[in-house]
Amino acid sequence: DQCNHRIMEWKRDATSGQVLTGGNGEGSGTHQLSYPLDVIVDKETDSLIICDRSNRRVVRWPRRNGTSGETIISNINCVGLTMDENGSLYIVDFGKDEVRRYRRGESQGTVVAGGNGSGNHLDQLNDPQYVFVDRNNSVYVSEWGNDRVMKWVEGAKQGIVVAGGQGQGNGLTQ
């Protein structure tokens, strides 16, 4: 619930939702969020990991009785995130046009897609939005700026266009 600065849980067939995190007004306190954009569940720690966009941070928030979150990554323009089978976190940094992988305990992360400035070359991203990681640790990134989806095989220096890349439109290649 981005504009209400909170994460809601809606159970199947429920008539109302429950506030899980935030809900204390917009702000930068440990009990607040500011325009959260994405959230995933970390099953190992039974917590939520949230892209707290306007606070430029990623926070971990306990799912049970959590009244505040813990900043796990600072100074990042996070718009999307996912986690692989090993518990590594992949975060889209919109401001740097890159995706970084953070293994548990890491604070800097490793660039796994983009990281060469904004652009349309195969080693660049332009306004990346969403990220997905498959079982082979290939990273898929959707780009708003290039109207394409890129696949970056683990260890690759450049990606492969797997969808779009032909400009905006409703054609089968767009």
Region spans (language model):
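Beta-propeller domains
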Residues: 1-21
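Conserved beta-propeller blade signature
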Residues: 47-49, 88-91, 139-141
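Structural WD40 beta-propeller signal
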Residues: 42-44, 84-86, 134
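Short loop/turn segments immediately following the C-termini of beta-strands
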Residues: 2, 12, 44, 53, ...
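Gly/Pro-rich loop segments of beta-rich domains
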Residues: 14-37, 64-77, 106-129, 155-174
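Hydrophobic/aromatic beta-strand positions that recur at structurally equivalent sites within the blades
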Residues: 10, 41, 60-62, 102, ...
